[in-house]
A protein has these predicted regions:
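Tandem CBS (Bateman) regulatory domains
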Residues: 1-19, 53, 57-92, 96-106, ...
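Acidic (E/D-rich), amphipathic helical modules within compact regulatory domains
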Residues: 31-67
């Protein structure tokens, strides 16, 4: 079991696109937050033509609220793209699960968007889903 786990690829354990939050750049932030909440993950991917434009995490929203100090309700009518992290840390679907977990630990993140060789968003690796294969 442990030997198999060491050799596992991200694509074997990633969350498929229909199970995590995605919005287009022109959707309102409220819609992005609603989808993030519905997915029960702390991330929403901003996607246009299947290409990842960026991500928004619940932590990004908290930090932005403290930084800007405008009423929370005012954020609801902002566009999602206005709050996006445009160069998110990503991984490839054929990367090893072990290397992805190490990257998540190093960068202190819970979620990694998964791209194919053409840069198309094909999944999301969530830390809990990843580490359960090692315990």
């Amino acid at each position: 079991m442990f030997i198999k786990t060491i050799k596992m690829k991200i694509k074997e354990v990633m969350i498929t696109p229909e199970k995590f939050a995605q919005v287009n750049p022109n959707e309102f932030l409220k819609e992005a937050l609603d989808k993030m909440t519905d997915s029960k993950l702390g991330i929403v991917c901003i996607v246009e033509d299947n290409l990842l434009k960026g991500v928004i995490t619940d932590g990004d929203i908290r930090r932005k609220l403290l930084e800007v100090q405008k009423p929370f309700s005012a954020f609801f009518i902002d566009y999602a793209i206005d709050h996006v992290i445009t160069n998110p840390i990503t991984c490839k679907e054929n990367d090893s699960l072990k290397s992805a977990i190490k990257l998540m630990e190093k960068k202190q993140i819970w979620d990694l968007p998964v791209l194919d060789d053409n840069g198309i968003l094909v999944g999301l690796l969530h830390l809990h889903a990843a580490i359960k294969h090692f315990i």
